[in-house]
Amino acid sequence: MIINISNKEDFQTLLKSEKPILLDFYADWCGPCKALLPIVEKLADKHKDDFAIAKINVDNNGELAQEFGVRSIPALFFLKDGKIQ
């Protein structure tokens, strides 16, 4: 399952999860982000018990994107115990 992060509070709640997290920073208008989506969806299906996948729209969550140093999209980060791996 893919979790859509709407705000920083959603993100903080997600960080409390014991599972590692794959963060996918994207934008609705981004062609490469759209091309990556089927791959992310397959990962979500195949590894649903191993890690969570969260999508973060940079247009709606600029502060989070800035915290992660996102300069271009798509941008993927893998977190374990709240830290980038």
Where in the sequence are the language-model features?
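Proteins that catalyze or organize thiol-disulfide redox chemistry
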Residues: 1-52, 59-85
